[in-house]
Amino acid sequence: MISKVKIGAQVFRVVERLREDDGMLSEGSLGYTLDDENLIVIQKNLSKSKKQVTLWHEILHAARMAWESNVRPKKTDEYEVWEHYFIGLYESVLLLVLRDNPELVDWLREED
């Protein structure tokens, strides 16, 4: 497991914790992101492949927090408008995450 990940201009610490030691890792929660602390927490006793998916999930949360603008489509806008909103939200930040974190890419490519 990696110990940090750069997301845009922010560096997030990545830690593993046991469910019984962390009340935020409630039933059904495998990880969480605290934006104000630049912290990503992953449940420690998961399989490697589940940790990989969970870390990527939390990176997406952090990316949204870092890059989301206040301009959102209206609820009544067409699907294509919303689709482009989400693609635009992630296109640059995900490219930066992959470029800035070669150790993350290597770790994500490892198999169980």
What are the residue ranges of the model-derived segments?
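Active-site recognition of the HExxH zinc-binding catalytic motif
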Residues: V53-M65
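Metalloprotease/metallohydrolase-associated module, dominated by Zn2+-dependent proteases
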Residues: M1-K50, A66-D112
